Structures are given as structure tokens and as C-alpha cells.
């Protein structure tokens, strides 16, 4: 059996104040029979990490951030033999991890398919406090401990860059599944995606793998719109350079989009999305994982007169992770350059630079290495 030499200490990144992360040494935690220790390979920076870095909305301090990570099992509790879907786990396997449901609330007891709505669930990398730091419960470090009850997936058949995109792709896969509750996707449907950051571009990729032939990407950055084209957008609209509402109407023969996905965290954008959608159309809001403020809309023009069907989307269910893996593999097979979204990689010691690069909007998905 493969055995790994594990040092006595490992580096951990700790958010200690607004826009201040320190890299510190902590003893490698012991694991119980129900826990797993992972050597981190790399972790994507999420918009939520950046919000925390800037001091909003939760202001979790101190905390070790990072929830889009992947790595190698180097120590395995004797009771942990299979992943969430029954795939065998062993030392050396590559893994990702999702939610850690509480197992006690009504959702966990009576509606296990919707563990993402667990009343007391945790996401590794968003667990504040000194205990979580000493447990290495975030992915921005050299090692990461998956506590008992954490959802684990064996993804040894995927390369490291593809694995790094599984968590955000699970977010958009869940949004597509929610959208199916209010919209019947057809190959000829006009599907509009507002916001071409990593989430919007991964959603675009997901919709493209569904065979949708009329994808409209809306953003104010030409570089991001170029990426939208690379990933399969049929039409692009730059709202900074043209009358975006008129352009969308022209593309859709005067009707408007059949289905719209709102992927930004901008309250203004959350209002504008309704203007793009046809009468009888549908919309899914997935851009607000933090409270960025209120928006305004006209109840007559935006809802009643159009009878727009609306749904919201929140994180993901366990099934969405498996679907996300399939989406990424298919995208790669189709030649869609999805791993090109990982535009910058930084060593652990330069995590503050990585955060500031993300804030500058110069890249797409910024990655922190576990070394």
C-alpha cells in the first residue's frame, strides 16, 4: 500500500483583517477513523473568497478560505472506504469535496436530496474560527482535513485543472436544473447569459454541451466576450458599447430571449435582465451568493405583462457534482477550451497578490497552488 511522508507542520493561510492574509505554520492535525487528510494541489479563488477578503458580507475573521480545491489523499481514516457515490477511496486518490451537512436538521433527516439547504451545514473554506484553522478546514493551504460527514468525490480520472473547475461548475449545473423547472430547453431556444465571469462562462459551457444553438452572452468586457465566443456563444453583446436591449431584440427577431441567466452580483444587472426576456419567457437568478443590496423592477412591465417565470439557485446538491464532472469531460472532448479559464496561478506565499489580481478583473479564474 502506498504510504506518504507527512511533515509535522504545514502552511496555512489566515485572513486576519481586511485585505490581509498571513501565511503561518500549523501542526498537521490528527485525523479520526472517519476523516481524511489531503495534500492540496491547487484551489480556485471564488468571488465569495474575494468578498471575505474585502471584509463583506460576513466578515469571517480569522478564517482559512478556499473551497474550490483539489488534492491527493495522504492519510485515510479506516472507516472511510468509499466516496459519496460508492466509488472506492484509497491513498493517492485525487479528490474534491462539497458540503458538510449537519445531519440533524429537518432537511438532512427528511429531504436528504436537498442537503444544500441544510440549516446548519458547512462549506470547507467558509468555516470561521481558530479551531477550523488548526483543523486545516480550508483549501488555501498545503494540507486540508475533511472532517467526518464531509461529502467527498473521487476524481482521479480528471486532470488537475479540470478538477479545479468542478465546484463552480456544480453551481451552474444546479442553476440549469432549477431553470428546467420553469423552462423547457430546446435546441433552438434563445438562451441569454448575463455576466461572463467564471460562473457565466461555465454556465455557457454547460448550456453548449446541451446542444443549444442560440446562446447570447452579455457583458461589458470585450476580453470576456471573446472567451464567450471560444466556449460556444453564438452571439455577444457589449452593453458598454451598444444598446444591449435593442441588440438582443434584433438577434431574437424582435421577441427577446426565451431563457435568461443572471450571473452577476450587480443589483442593476438583476433589474436589467428582465428587459432582455420575451413575454412568456423564463429567468434564473444565480448571481447573488452574498447580499450585494436591493434591486428595482417594474411589476407591470417586468412580471405581470410578460408573465415571466422566475427561479433562484443556491449552491448545489451532491448530484450536481457528478453532473458537473460529466459536463467538463464533454466540454473537453468537444474541444471547448474550458481549462483556459484558469488564467493565473500563484504560489501560496503570494496569495495576497492572487486576491488583488482577482479584484483587478484582469484575469478569469485565479488559482492558488498548494505549495
Predicted feature descriptions by range:
Residues 83, 104-194:
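NAD(P)H dinucleotide-binding glycine-rich loop of Rossmann-like/cofactor-binding domains
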Residues 183, 252, 264, 276-278:
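A generic alpha-to-beta junction signature in SAM-dependent methyltransferases
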Amino acid at each position: 500500500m502506498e504510504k506518504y511522508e507527512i511533515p509535522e507542520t504545514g502552511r496555512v493561510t489566515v485572513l486576519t483583517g481586511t485585505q490581509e492574509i498571513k501565511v503561518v505554520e500549523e501542526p498537521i492535525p490528527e485525523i479520526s477513523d472517519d476523516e481524511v487528510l489531503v495534500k492540496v494541489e491547487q484551489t480556485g479563488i471564488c468571488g465569495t473568497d474575494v468578498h471575505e477578503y474585502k471584509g463583506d458580507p460576513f466578515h469571517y475573521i480569522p478564517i482559512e478560505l478556499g473551497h474550490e480545491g483539489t488534492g491527493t489523499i495522504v492519510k485515510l481514516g479506516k472507516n472511510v472506504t468509499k466516496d459519496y457515490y460508492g466509488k472506492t477511496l484509497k491513498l493517492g486518490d485525487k479528490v474534491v469535496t462539497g458540503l458538510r451537512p449537519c445531519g440533524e436538521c429537518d432537511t438532512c433527516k427528511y429531504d436528504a436530496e436537498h442537503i444544500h439547504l441544510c440549516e446548519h451545514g458547512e462549506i470547507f473554506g467558509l468555516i470561521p474560527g481558530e479551531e477550523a484553522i488548526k483543523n486545516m478546514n480550508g483549501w488555501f493551504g498545503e494540507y486540508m482535513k475533511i472532517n467526518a460527514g464531509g461529502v467527498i468525490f473521487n476524481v482521479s480520472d480528471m486532470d488537475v485543472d479540470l478538477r479545479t473547475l468542478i465546484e463552480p461548475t456544480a453551481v451552474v449545473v444546479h442553476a440549469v436544473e432549477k431553470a428546467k423547472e420553469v423552462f423547457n430547453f430546446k435546441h433552438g431556444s434563445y438562451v441569454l447569459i448575463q455576466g461572463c465571469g467564471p460562473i457565466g462562462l461555465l454556465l455557457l459551457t454547460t448550456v453548449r454541451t446541451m446542444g443549444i444553438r442560440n446562446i447570447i452572452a452579455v457583458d461589458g468586457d470585450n476580453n470576456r466576450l471573446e472567451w464567450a465566443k471560444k466556449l460556444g456563444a453564438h452571439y455577444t453583446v457589449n452593453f458598454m458599447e451598444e444598446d444591449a436591449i435593442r441588440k438582443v431584440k434584433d438577434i431574437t427577431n424582435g421577441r427577446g430571449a426565451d431563457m435568461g441567466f443572471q450571473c452577476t452580483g450587480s443589483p442593476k444587472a438583476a433589474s436589467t435582465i428582465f428587459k432582455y426576456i420575451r413575454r412568456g419567457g423564463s429567468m434564473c437568478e444565480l448571481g447573488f451568493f452574498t447580499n450585494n443590496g436591493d434591486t428595482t423592477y417594474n411589476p407591470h412591465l417586468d412580471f405581470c405583462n410578460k408573465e415571466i417565470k422566475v427561479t433562484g439557485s443556491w449552491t448545489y446538491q451532491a448530484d450536481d457534482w457528478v453532473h458537473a464532472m460529466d459536463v467538463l469531460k464533454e466540454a473537453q472532448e468537444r474541444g471547448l477550451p474550458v481549462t483556459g479559464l484558469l488564467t493565473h496561478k500563484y504560489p501560496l506565499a503570494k496569495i495576497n497578490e492572487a486576491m488583488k489580481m482577482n479584484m483587478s478583473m484582469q484575469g478569469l479564474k485565479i488559482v492558488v497552488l498548494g505549495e
